[in-house]
Amino acid sequence: MKKVLIVEDQRMPRENMERILLDSGKYKLCASVNGADVALAVCRREKIDLILM
């Protein structure tokens, strides 16, 4: 299962992407964040396969 990180500053588009990923059952959502600083921290501790921005 591919590990995904979502980076989006607007709440609604971020939540929509989360829902689509989770409903597909094909991806593991590692984190969904609203900024680059938090995204970099996630990338340092997780092996991310795909980043959606």
Question: Over which residues does each language-model region extend?
Answer:
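Helix N-cap/capping motif at the beta->alpha junctions
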Residues: 32-41
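Active-site beta3 strand of CheY-like receiver
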Residues: 46-52
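Conserved acidic carboxylate
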Residues: 8
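Two-component/phosphorelay signaling modules centered on CheY-like receiver
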Residues: 11-31
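Non-catalytic signal-transmission and effector/linker regions of two-component phosphorelay proteins
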Residues: 1-3
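Conserved phosphotransfer microenvironments
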Residues: 36, 52-53
